[in-house]
Structure formats: C-alpha cells, structure tokens
Amino acid sequence: LLLIPFLLSLSGSAQIINFGQDRAALRWKQIKTDQFQIIYPDFFEKNAQRMANIYQQLYTHSHTSGIHPRKIAMVVHADGGVSNGNVALVPRKSELYVLPPQNPTDTWLEHLCTHEFRHVMQLDKVNQGTTKGLSYIFGELFPIAVVGLYIPMWFMEGDAVAYETSVGRIGRGRSPEFLNEMKAQILEKGIYNYSKAVL
C-alpha cells in the first residue's frame, strides 16, 4: 500500500516525450539492402521507397571518395514536430526526423538524407587505422572521443553542408536564405577572425 504513491509518481515522469519516442500505435515496416536498413512507419511507405533510392545513389557515390560505409540502420520518425537527424555508432544507426520544413521543396527529403549520410561517412572515415585499433581497447565509442577532441563540430557540419551542396541539385550552399546572414555580416562588419567566427 505504501508503494502505490511511489509507483504512480514514476509513471508520471515516464510520459515525457523526447525526439526518440513514437506513438505505440504506429505500425513499422522496413526496407533492407546490403548497404542499409530503413525502418519507418507504414504510412511513410512512398517516402521510404524514395529514401531507399537516395541512399542507394549516395552509397554508390561514396566509393568515388574512397569511403565505403558499413551497413547502417536508418530509423525514420515521421510523426514528430521537428526536421533533423543524427548518427550514432552504438548502436550503429541514423535517426531521421522527417517533418517537412515550413517551405518544403520537392528535395527536402533528399537534403536531409544526404546531410546525415555524410555524417555516416565522416564517422566511418574516423574509425579506421589507429583509431579503429584503439577502439578495440577503449570501446566502440572511442571514435566519438577522437571527433570530440580533434575535429570541431563546425567542421563536421560545414563538411556535411558542402557535401549536400556538391553531390546533387540541393544543398544549403545553393540557398540564398542560408547565405544571407553571412553575406550581411561581411558587408556590415567585415570578415571576423577565426576566434570570433567560431563563437
């Protein structure tokens, strides 16, 4: 009887929703290839097929840069309130939050997939040679420590933006809206030095 208030208080805190939670009622499907697995809600079927085509092209293109990404699971959260993504090494997956932006174009999904795939390529590139050897000693998350210590996040994101711009007809490097803030700052205040620019 004394445990009931305690148990009720725990159930209340379990109702907090974060990016990674989806409604329990969702039905999930998957597309599997030799290179990737896309896990998605059943109502997202048409776009999941589109994503599979995008990823197949990206995998083929990645070999031209000498990077051969290992198989990865792409988990699609199509029922949330954000458009974003992330890549994790443990467990190896990419999570895509695919709410279209307010001014969606027909390329918004291609843009998101391309950007996050570049992060997959980056982490696979870091996880080779000495880093890979040391990850057997220090664990699977060791490459993330290497990134955190030696590669600034602005470089990781800038590289992903440059990649999304270079591989197709999309990318923020082609978007006046994305470049306007930097152009205005340069015209009004000049080019900031490195220390000020990275703040």
Where are the regions that the model predicts?
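Catalytic Zn2+-binding segment of zinc metalloproteases
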Residues: 117-133, 159-176
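Juxtacatalytic substrate-recognition/specificity segment
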Residues: 14-146, 152, 188, 195-196
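Bacterial N-terminal signal peptides
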Residues: 1-9
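An active-site-proximal "capping" alpha-helix that borders the catalytic cofactor pocket
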Residues: 55-63, 155-168
